[in-house]
């Protein structure tokens, strides 16, 4: 599984950073540790003497965490963020993005630039493409947010697939401007498999002639318009950002 922490670990390695302050649950820093990067948390020795502050999923974040992060940045650490999305969909409905709120507080105090490692970062899309051994234009990005997944796909020339089981409904997708409009609107995640299955038959032709992808997408968009008629709303859980 590839997560924002996977991209963060790769980024920190490329930057030559050996030690990071992690604002997040214990699992947030695991990918960093697996990559040989030492992680520390608020209250531990040397928490403000690090090369990077990495902000991830941290529901229990307190003012001491924010203060420690700010001190580390004032000491020269760079700011790395897993997600800058203000809201996302869960079983309970719309939920705030903790890392977005935490990062906003840190940046308000420090005015530090940030490096985003999750969606819609082109860095994340590039990492996935490299891991899979394919160009970014061969990827499909699936999601429920026009300013996250669709924007990410557009930045890398990938196919953007929208679902209506999260924060954006079918009618809202149709009203999006061209820059945030998906290539296809799917009622639920299970339809992704059939979409990819249909597209897979054309894979050799697309691989041989990359420039024909736009024509292929237009054809798929027309076919998907019929399959994506509004359906009764279903409550579903999407993978967290």
Question: Which ranges hold each PLM region?
Answer:
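Asp-based, Mg2+/Mn2+-dependent phosphohydrolase catalytic module
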Residues: 2, 6-224, 229-241
């Amino acid at each position: 599984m590839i997560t924002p922490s996977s991209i963060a670990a790769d980024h920190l390695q490329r930057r030559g950073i050996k030690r990071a302050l992690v604002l997040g649950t214990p699992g947030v820093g695991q990918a960093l540790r697996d990559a040989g990067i030492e992680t520390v948390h608020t209250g531990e020795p040397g928490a403000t003497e690090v090369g990077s502050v990495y902000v991830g999923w941290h529901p229990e974040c307190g003012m001491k965490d924010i203060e420690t992060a700010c001190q580390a940045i004032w000491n020269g650490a760079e700011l790395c963020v897993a997600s800058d999305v203000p809201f996302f969909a869960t079983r309970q409905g719309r939920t705030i993005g903790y890392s977005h709120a935490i990062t906003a507080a840190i940046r308000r105090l420090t005015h530090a630039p940030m490096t985003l490692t999750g969606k819609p970062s082109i860095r994340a899309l590039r990492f996935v493409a490299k891991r899979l051994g394919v160009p970014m234009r061969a990827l499909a990005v699936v999601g429920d947010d026009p300013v996250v997944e669709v924007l990410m796909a557009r930045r890398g020339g990938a196919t953007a697939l929208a679902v209506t089981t999260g924060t954006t409904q079918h009618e809202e997708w149709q009203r999006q401007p061209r820059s945030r409009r998906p290539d296809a609107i799917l009622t639920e995640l299970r339809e992704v498999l059939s979409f990819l299955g249909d597209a897979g038959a054309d894979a050799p032709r697309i691989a041989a002639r990359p420039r024909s992808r736009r024509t292929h997408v237009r054809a798929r968009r027309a076919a998907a318009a019929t399959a994506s008629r509004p359906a009764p709303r279903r409550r579903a859980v999407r993978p967290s950002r």
